Regions:
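N-terminal basic/disordered segments at the start of proteins
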Residues: 1-33
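Small-residue (GG/TT-enriched) beta-loop-alpha framework at ligand/catalytic clefts
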Residues: 14, 29, 111-205
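Short glycine-rich phosphate-binding loop at a beta-alpha junction
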Residues: 17, 65-78, 207-218
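Short glycine-rich, Thr/Ser-proximal phosphate-binding strand/loop in the N-terminal lobe
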Residues: 22-48, 175-189
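Loop/turn residues immediately N-terminal
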Residues: 23-26, 77, 166-169
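Hydrophobic anchor at the start of a short beta-strand
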Residues: 25, 70, 235
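Active-site neighborhood for divalent-cation/phosphate handling
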Residues: 30, 37-47, 51-151
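Accessory, usually C-terminal, subdomains that scaffold auxiliary metal cofactors
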Residues: 179, 183-241
Length: 241
C-alpha cells in the first residue's frame, strides 16, 4: 500500500473509485481531468466477516483525500440486461433470477438505465459488503464494473472481454448496439479464444471486422496475452482501473 496521499492532494475536487474483490481491493483517486493521481492496493481475503472488512476499510480511510464522489465498483457475475419497455423496478430481482436462479438471498439488487441503449442493467451484490462501505462512506455510489464500458460502446464494432481468475464477461456491440452481454467460466487462454470465436460464429459476424479489447489486472492479462494474440491479433490489452 502506498503512503498517505493527503500530504500532496489538497484543495482539488477529487473522485474516488474503490474496486472490491474477494482477494482485496484497489482504490483509485481521479482528478478533475479524470486522470489517476494516486492508487492504493490492499490485499484482503473476504470470508463473509463484515467486522474484519470494516477494519480493513477503516485502515485505508486516513490515507484518502476528501473527495466529491466515491464509487464502489462491484465485480459479480450476477447480472442481466432487460429492455426498458419490460423493466419494472419492483420486479428487478425476478428479472435477474430468470438468468441467475441461484442469486443469494443475502444479495442486494441494483439497476441502471442507460441513456444511449434501450436497456436496463440489473445486478446483485452482497448486501453485507455494501452496507459496510456505506457505513464508512455514506454518500457512496454503487456501480457494476461493466456499466461504464456499456455506456461507452457507441457507434463501435467491438468485443470487450473482462477477465478475472476463473471467469470472463463478454460484451459485443455492433454499430453501437449491444448484441450480447454474458458471463462465462474459463481455465485457459484457449478457453477465452474459444468463447469469442464461438460467439462471433453463432451471431454470424466476421471476427476480423471487430475491435477486441481485453480488460483485467496486469498480471492476469499478461498470462493470456500470447495465446490470445495468436488467434485474435487485433486484440488490445488494457488494465482495469
Amino acid at each position: 500500500m502506498r503512503g498517505n496521499m493527503n500530504a500532496t492532494l489538497v484543495d482539488i475536487p477529487y473522485r474516488l473509485s474503490i474496486r472490491f474483490a474477494t482477494n482485496g481491493f484497489s482504490v483509485y483517486v481521479y482528478d478533475v481531468n479524470d486522470k489517476i493521481v494516486a492508487t492504493i492496493n490492499l490485499a484482503y481475503q473476504h470470508s463473509g466477516d463484515t467486522d474484519s472488512l470494516r477494519e480493513a476499510v477503516l485502515s485505508l480511510k486516513p490515507s484518502l483525500p476528501d473527495c466529491q464522489s466515491i464509487t464502489l465498483i462491484c465485480e459479480t457475475g450476477f447480472y442481466t440486461l432487460v429492455p426498458k419497455s419490460f423493466f419494472v423496478s419492483e420486479h428487478a430481482l425476478d428479472f435477474l433470477k430468470l438468468q441467475h436462479p441461484d442469486v443469494p438471498e443475502t444479495d442486494q439488487v441494483f439497476s441502471h438505465s442507460f441513456q444511449n441503449h434501450d436497456s436496463v442493467f440489473i445486478f446483485a451484490y452482497d448486501a453485507g459488503i455494501i452496507q459496510t462501505f456505506i457505513d464508512i462512506f455514506p454518500s457512496l455510489k454503487i456501480e457494476h464494473q461493466l456499466i461504464p464500458f456499456v455506456e461507452q460502446a457507441e457507434r463501435q464494432d467491438i468485443i470487450s472481454i473482462f477477465i478475472r481468475e476463473e471467469s470472463m464477461d463478454c460484451l459485443l456491440c455492433h454499430q453501437g448496439i449491444i448484441k450480447l452481454l454474458n458471463h462465462y467460466p474459463y481455465q485457459t487462454a484457449e478457453d477465452i479464444v474459444y468463447h469469442v470465436l464461438n460467439i462471433a460464429h453463432h451471431l454470424q459476424y466476421d471476427i476480423t471486422e471487430f475491435e477486441i479489447a481485453v480488460y483485467g489486472d496486469e498480471a492476469n492479462t499478461k498470462n493470456h496475452e500470447e495465446v490470445i494474440r495468436t488467434y485474435l491479433p487485433q486484440t488490445d490489452f488494457r488494465t482495469i482501473q
